[in-house]
Amino acid sequence: MKKRLIACMALAVLVALPGVSAASQALFLQKCGACHKKGGTAAPINPADKAGQVWEKYFERGRHPGDPGASGGDLKAIIDYLKAHAADSDQPAAAVIPK
């Protein structure tokens, strides 16, 4: 049931945010949402919380502990998603991690 809810929410956001890579968004929801959901171990986030360059530098400087299960390619896709929907982007995203 929970997986269906996440899939439905992801689909709704995809429709609302044209040009989003479905795979990148799915990684964001899965990997980031594991901790950054309401009641999770980390504060809730959404891409529009920061400017694109801030997201990139945040990860470059190693400030985020990361997901031990995320490969380098997954992390790049997540960062690309965050930058594409950051506060200073053409399509800033509202919160998309299920609460």
How should each PLM-predicted stretch be described?
Residues 1-9:
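Bacterial N-terminal signal peptides that target proteins for export
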Residues 8-16:
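Bacterial N-terminal signal peptides
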Residues 17-23:
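Sec/Tat signal peptide C-region and signal peptidase I cleavage site
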Residues 25, 29:
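Residues immediately within or flanking Cys/His clusters that coordinate Zn2+
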Residues 31-40, 78:
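The canonical Cys-X-X-Cys-His
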Residues 42-80:
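N-terminal, post-signal-peptide region of Sec/Tat-exported proteins
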Residues 69-99:
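C-terminal capping alpha-helices of c-type cytochrome domains
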